[in-house]
Amino acid sequence: MNKIVLLDASPLGMISNPSATPANLECYNWMESLLMSGYQIIVPEIADYEVRRELLRAGKTRGLARLDLLKNTLDYLPLTTAVMLKAAELWAQARNQGTPTADAKALDCDVILAAQALAENGIVATENVGHLSLFVEAKDWRDILPVS
């Protein structure tokens, strides 16, 4: 059982959101249960970028503070040259196979996240299984269950 979980932007955004909506609380409690079960939860730099840019745009200072807290509390995975080179390979592979995951001129965060997950031999917790599962093990975050 893979116990390394990389958070995609969607669950990371829910966990860092200070609004105690039922969905946000469910996601936060899910993360806590995985941690208590011995999972390593990783905040990938590319997911931090996706969440952070929107929080900055919207002036959500409480969300930024929570995101910073998560970044400093959980394991943070910075981007590296090796990861970016692998992401470029994945991007080209997807295009050549007719399965692009983003516009040709867009920064494709999914392939960058997939490259980070491959480097860590981890599973991606997401709400966007389709694109990510082309490259790496990805599951809806609700389907990654703690082990006893």
Language model feature labels by segment:
Residues 2-4, 33, 114-148:
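Acidic, PIN/NYN-like endoribonuclease modules and their adjacent C-terminal/linker elements
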